[in-house]
Amino acid sequence: MKASELLQKDQAALNKELADLLKAQFGLRMQLATQQLTNTSQLKKVRRDIARVRTVMTQKANQK
């Protein structure tokens, strides 16, 4: 997800997006631990998406 798309969302939508990404990250970590994950680059993508969401949330909080 692009940062420009995240900037258009409100705080509730960002919280929901963050929760979804954290669940996805947990699932990917479990797949990696049980050697079921074949595309390990997904971990990096999800981790960076989480960072983007948290950055946008911080930016919006500092604007107020």
Curated annotation (Swiss-Prot):
GO terms for biological process: translation. GO terms for molecular function: structural constituent of ribosome. Keywords: Ribonucleoprotein, Ribosomal protein. GO terms for cellular component: cytosolic large ribosomal subunit. InterPro entries: Ribosomal_protein_uL29, Ribosomal_uL29, Ribosomal_uL29_CS, Ribosomal_uL29_sf. The keyword Ribonucleoprotein applies. Pfam families: Ribosomal_L29. The keyword Hydrolase does not apply. Belongs to the universal ribosomal protein uL29 family. HAMAP family: Ribosomal_uL29. This is Large ribosomal subunit protein uL29. The gene is rpmC.
